[in-house]
């Protein structure tokens, strides 16, 4: 890999496909460089982990309920013993509302994406067609060098056969 990477190939493929699956070296550091390149190209990035997402479609595009960690404490009311449900606005919608005026769009950078099911990855693949200002980068695994391909090409072989 070159010492100085411009990231133009990733940006070009992200604009072409709308969503890409990346394979990053396990020692890390590369995602920060590429996120910086995306911000320099005019995108706003939002990074979060795939662990604990639950329903990806509801989390990103719909109002969804969350419960804070109960830390061993129980509520004494008639509700659930693990605490109240707090409803949060859709992440994508609220982030798009607050984009700077000259921004090209929002890039969702999802780390630990290897734990996502193929149905969840399929939704993430279709998300840029539902909202054209949203691009998706999912870390699908590790590799010796930083590489990427279209997210639809990262489905498991058993899912592609269906």
From Swiss-Prot:
Annotated Pfam families: NdhN
Reactions it catalyzes: a plastoquinone + NADH + (n+1) H(+)(in) = a plastoquinol + NAD(+) + n H(+)(out); a plastoquinone + NADPH + (n+1) H(+)(in) = a plastoquinol + NADP(+) + n H(+)(out)
GO MF annotations, alphabetized: oxidoreductase activity, acting on NAD(P)H, quinone or similar compound as acceptor; quinone binding
Main location: membrane
Entries under InterPro entries matching the protein: NAD(P)H-quinone_OxRdtase_su_N
Gene that encodes the chain: ndhN
Function noted in UniProt: NDH-1 shuttles electrons from an unknown electron donor, via FMN and iron-sulfur (Fe-S) centers, to quinones in the respiratory and/or the photosynthetic chain. The immediate electron acceptor for the enzyme in this species is believed to be plastoquinone. Couples the redox reaction to proton translocation, and thus conserves the redox energy in a proton gradient. Cyanobacterial NDH-1 also plays a role in inorganic carbon-concentration.
Keywords noted in UniProt: Membrane, NAD, NADP, Plastoquinone, Quinone, Thylakoid, Translocase, Transport
Record protein name field: NAD(P)H-quinone oxidoreductase subunit N
Subcellular localization: Cellular thylakoid membrane
UniProt GO cellular component terms: plasma membrane-derived thylakoid membrane
Annotated signal sequence range: none
Oligomeric and partner information: NDH-1 can be composed of about 15 different subunits; different subcomplexes with different compositions have been identified which probably have different functions.
Entry-linked PANTHER family: NAD(P)H-QUINONE OXIDOREDUCTASE SUBUNIT N, CHLOROPLASTIC (PTHR35515:SF1)
Family membership: Belongs to the complex I NdhN subunit family.
Topology with respect to the bilayer: Peripheral membrane protein
EC code: 7.1.1.-
Keyword Zinc-finger: no
């Amino acid at each position: 890999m070159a010492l100085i990477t411009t990231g133009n190939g990733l940006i070009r493929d992200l604009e072409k496909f709308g969503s890409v699956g990346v394979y990053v070296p396990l020692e890390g550091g590369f995602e920060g460089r590429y996120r910086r390149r995306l911000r320099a190209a005019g995108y706003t990035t939002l990074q979060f982990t795939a662990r604990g997402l639950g329903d990806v479609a509801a989390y990103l595009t719909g109002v969804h309920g969350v419960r804070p960690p109960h830390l061993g404490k129980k509520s004494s009311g008639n509700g659930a013993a693990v605490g109240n449900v707090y409803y949060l606005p859709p992440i994508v919608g609220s982030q798009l509302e607050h984009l700077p005026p000259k921004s090209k769009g929002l890039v969702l950078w999802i780390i630990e994406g290897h734990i996502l099911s193929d149905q969840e990855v399929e939704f993430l693949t279709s998300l840029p067609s539902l909202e054209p200002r949203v691009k998706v980068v999912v870390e699908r695994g590790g590799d010796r060098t930083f590489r990427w391909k279209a997210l639809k090409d990262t489905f498991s072989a058993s899912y592609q056969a269906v």
